[in-house]
Amino acid sequence: MDSLLWATWVLCLLNLWGVALGHLHLECDFITQLRDDELACLQAAEGTNNSSMGCPGTWDGLLCWPPTGSGQWVSLPCPEFFSHFGSDPGAVKRDCTITGWSDPFPPYPVACPVPLELLTEEKSYFSTVKIIYTTGHSISIVALCVAIAILVALRRLHCPRNYIHTQLFATFILKASAVFLKDAAVFQGDSTDHCSMSTILCKVSVAVSHFATMTNFSWLLAEAVYLSCLLASTSPRSKPAFWWLVLAGWGLPVLCTGTWVGCKLAFEDTACWDLDDSSPYWWIIKGPIVLSVGVNFGLFLNIICILLRKLGPAQGGLHTRAQYCNYLLPWSCPLPQVPRERTDLGPSSHEITVQESGTRNCQLPWRLSKSTLLLIPLFGIHYIIFNFLPDSAGLGIRLPLELGLGSFQGFVVAVLYCFLNQEVRTEISRKWYGHDPELLPARRTCTEWTTPPRSRVKVLTSEC
């Protein structure tokens, strides 16, 4: 097997990694390295006098053989890229004979081995990963579209909290759609040379993918900021600037992505804009994402501390407990019933009792552990695992977690914060079965409020 045929076979194997990793095109790195080596070899050969007896410098597709005198042997190590296959690359020898260069010895498949079983194993593995993330994104898109339709159609559910949820759902849809667009544009088929592809569609798909990713992280951060402000506020009517969150959630990704596109057009308009993660312009995209994940993690810890401090038996006030049940555990607080006055009025005739709305069941340890787990998909805390590692680190674990499980994040968020939301379920039931609208006030929370002893009242409050 000659060097060109062996290089082609290696590229076929590397292409499997490229399809699975999206922007980590190992085969493109290999091709780029070969092209650089070939160019350097040809330039060196042009500056050498080949008129003397012997063998001229030549490029055989993998290695650059220098000018050599007749009867001499030359030994060169295999290209460094073969070390990716976990084996120690050997060396190849060639003899300069009277008739020219001899064939490489040992042959390239022997000197620069690639385990043949990798072809089948890696193809099966990466194909499975692609099927998983394609299925996950498809399910997420359907679930998120239904969730947005519900939150938009039911007027009683309109409030800042659900507005932010809707924006986050939209970013998950955009992110999943960008994955499909990029797969279609960059990996159109096995014969597509996406390493040298420089079409407008390819570049647009990469830019849209980066924009979708940034908007998703920005709205994950918006969720954390909103909840932190909500829990830290002292007045039930104090609200964070919702429209500032909207402006930041969509405006900052537009600004960063636009800046990155401008830099690529001006300074690095090569191939499909998605090959060199070492480029300094890559940090225009990567930097804000790393920062948002770090801030989100800090807010996550801060929220847990606030809940521990304010939700104790003697410290949990009306406003904080209301926000806790309404935001973190929206499906587990039983619905309030219509107030009923007592008919057996005795000495305590000034007391009006309303059925408990579920706060009594909000035991701190159990609720705190549940809310902690539920904040992880809502804030994207799981991204902290790989976000500060190099893109090529831990690929064996990173691929199934980030591409596979990450594709279902939108579905999980839609289920937890819409389909299992008690407020949403009751409003749907009211619309479907015609229940009394008073059973679901527009902005209901599960709280209780105790007035002075002679007139103890338990009421429902409105807080979103």
Swiss-Prot record:
Residues 1-22 form the signal peptide. GO terms for cellular component: cell surface; cytoplasm; membrane; nuclear inner membrane; nuclear matrix; nuclear outer membrane; plasma membrane; sarcolemma. SMART domains: HormR (SM00008). Coiled coil: none annotated. It is a multi-pass membrane protein. Glycans are attached at N50. Pituitary gland. The keyword Transmembrane helix applies. Disulfide bonds join C41-C64, C55-C96, C78-C112. The keyword Glycosyltransferase does not apply. Residues 152-167, 232-240, 305-372, 420-464 are cytoplasmic. Pfam families: 7tm_2, HRM. Residues 23-130, 189-210, 262-283, 394-398 are extracellular. One of its GO terms (biological process) is mammary gland development. InterPro entries: GPCR_2, GPCR_2-like_7TM, GPCR_2_extracell_dom_sf, GPCR_2_extracellular_dom, GPCR_2_GHRH_rcpt, GPCR_2_secretin-like, GPCR_2_secretin-like_CS. GO terms for molecular function: G protein-coupled peptide receptor activity; growth factor binding; growth hormone-releasing hormone receptor activity; peptide hormone binding. It comes from the Eukaryota. Keywords: Cell membrane, Disulfide bond, G-protein coupled receptor, Glycoprotein, Membrane, Receptor, Signal, Transducer, Transmembrane, Transmembrane helix. Receptor for GRF, coupled to G proteins which activate adenylyl cyclase. Stimulates somatotroph cell growth, growth hormone gene transcription and growth hormone secretion. Belongs to the G-protein coupled receptor 2 family. This is Growth hormone-releasing hormone receptor. It comes from Rattus norvegicus. The lineage of its organism: Eukaryota, Metazoa, Chordata, Craniata, Vertebrata. The gene is Ghrhr.
